Amino acid sequence: MTPEEYLEGQVLLIDKPLKWSSFQAVNKLKYLLINKVGLPKKFKIGHAGTLDPLATGLLLICTGKFTKKISELQGQAKEYTGTFYIGATTPSYDLETEIDQTFPTEHINEVLIHETVKQFLGEIDQKPPIFSAIKKDGVRLYEHARAGESIEIESRKTTIHEFEITRIALPEIDFRVVCSKGTYIRSLAYDFGKAMNSGSHLTVLRRTKIGDYDVKNAIDITLFEESLQ
C-alpha cells in the first residue's frame, strides 16, 4: 500500500497480542508506517475501541482521513469469546489482580448456569470495574483503586444482544457474547457469579467481531511488520 492510500484512509484489522495495550499497538503501527512506508510524522492514526492488555483479538486501527470514522466504528456491536472462572473474585474482575474472595460452587449446575444467562439478555444495568479508565471527579477509577480508595461507581445501561455458554467444565465456563458499546465483560463475569450466589472472574477474553469486521480477517502485528519489508 502506498503512503497516499494510508493518508486517504484505511481501517487496519489487527489481532492484538496478549499483554499489549491498545495504545502500544497504535504506537507500533505508527512507528512502522513512518519508518517503513514513509508517512509524515504527524499523520493521523487511532483505534476504534480499547482492548484491555489481558485481552486479545480484533483492534480496528484507522489511518489518515478514516480517523473521522472512529466514533462511528466505536458504536458498533462487539462480539467476544472467553472464560469465566467460577467460585472466586478479584478486585479487577480479571487476572490483573490476585483472588480476594472464594465462594461455594457445590450448588452450581448446568441448569442454573443456563437460567442465569437469561437474566443478562437485553438491556441491563452494569457497574464498570473500579480497575477501569472511566473518570470520576476528573480522576480515572483505576487511580482511585490503586490508592486504596473506596468510591461509589454509578451503574450504566448497556445491552447484551446475545449470550451463550459454549463449554462447561467447572470451575471454568466458556462463553460468547454480542454486546453494545461500553459493555465491560469483566463486570459481566463478576455479576454472573454473583447472580448464581457465588463469585466469578474473567480469565480469558478475545474480541472476535466489531460490526461486520471479523478477527478472521485480522493480521498479527509481527506479520504486518514483515509485509512492509
Curated annotation (Swiss-Prot):
Pfam families associated with the record: TruB_N (PF01509)
Gene3D superfamilies in the record: Pseudouridine synthase
EC number: 5.4.99.25
Protein known as: tRNA pseudouridine synthase B
Gene encoding the protein: truB
Recorded family membership: Belongs to the pseudouridine synthase TruB family. Type 1 subfamily.
CDD domains reported in the protein's UniProt record: PseudoU_synth_EcTruB
GO biological process, one term: tRNA pseudouridine synthesis
